[in-house]
Amino acid sequence: MAKQGQEAMKKAIQNARGAGVGLGLVAAAGAAVYGVAQSMFTVEAGHRAIMFNRIGGLSTDLYKEGLHFRIPWFQYPIIYDIRARPNQIRSPTGSKDLQMVNIGLRVLSRPNPEHLVHIYRTLGQNWEERVLPSICNEVLKGVVAKFNASQLITQRQQVSMLVRKTLIERALDFNIILDDVSLTELAFSPQYSAAVEAKQVAAQEAQRATFYVERAKQQKQEKIVQAEGEAESAKLLGEAMKNDPGFLKLRKIRAAQKIARIVSESGNKTYLPTGGLMLNIADTDYLNVTDKRR
């Protein structure tokens, strides 16, 4: 019995040793897999990475898109998104004539990939929040202060170009690239807007009054010309009647011819006496006039 117990103990010890070896192998394999996984990192498209070393600090190497290796627990990557991202910034500021202006700005910004190490040391990874609001407000206040409120409306394109140029140059001081800068909003205080509207209404009323005055002058001139023409016509007609008694008879004949032509072209048959045609053929004056015309 004692021998059987000893043999059983030996078998149990051997089995335990075998199980321990198996567990050790599994643990070693798991650690190896974990180590390999931790030694690799991927840089996605549109991103760049820099490496921090626990011993030497930041490395100047720049890691582009793709799969890269590192020393686990000693090195870890810092990945930056270098794609342009939109930022909306609004700033209340004052114009040259001390009018309050609310300006909205849309900025497409991205970090300079060649200076990611310096950006991380000075600004960290939230560089947009640290830089863009301050420099945008600074540039907007400086540019808007050069223009009157009315010039901000009439010269908006020039204002936008000046803001763009100044802001791009200012952002380069922080190694930030601005791909686009555009004014999206330009609003004034309610009091100024009401004053501008009243001024426009007054200008329209003045233009309307000027139009009415010019039209009245033209109508007056037309009446003067018409009256002068009628007076000249009456004068000539009077002289003709005075110098030639048959002139009136001739006008009667022409009027009668016109009436006769109209009546003849009508579908209705109408008979008019000579008196109805303003003619009196039996009149001796008529005969004398016709003889003279012959």
UniProtKB/Swiss-Prot annotation:
SMART domains, A to Z: PHB (SM00244)
CDD domains: SPFH_prohibitin
Major site of localization recorded for this protein: mitochondrion
Residues forming coiled coils: 212-237
PANTHER family: PROHIBITIN, PROHIBITIN-2
Mitochondrion in keyword set: yes
Molecular-function annotations in GO: protein homodimerization activity
Record's keyword terms, sorted: Coiled coil, Membrane, Mitochondrion, Mitochondrion inner membrane, Signal-anchor, Transmembrane, Transmembrane helix
GO cellular component: cell surface; mitochondrial inner membrane; mitochondrial membrane; mitochondrial prohibitin complex; mitochondrion; plasma membrane
Gene: phb-2
Gene3D superfamilies assigned to the protein according to its UniProt record, in alphabetical order: Band 7 domain
Source species of the chain: Caenorhabditis elegans
Protein's membrane topology: Single-pass type II membrane protein
Keyword Transmembrane helix carried by entry: yes
GO biological process terms, semicolon-separated: defecation; embryo development ending in birth or egg hatching; gonad development; mitochondrion organization; mitophagy; oogenesis; positive regulation of multicellular organism growth; protein stabilization
Subcellular location: Mitochondrion inner membrane
Subunit structure comment from the entry: High molecular weight complex that consist of phb-1 and phb-2.
Transmembrane segments annotated in the record for this chain: 20-42
Function field: PHB proteins are essential during embryonic development and are required for somatic and germline differentiation in the larval gonad. A deficiency in PHB proteins results in altered mitochondrial biogenesis in body wall muscle cells. Required for clearance of paternal mitochondria after embryonic fertilization.
Family: Belongs to the prohibitin family.
Protein name: Mitochondrial prohibitin complex protein 2
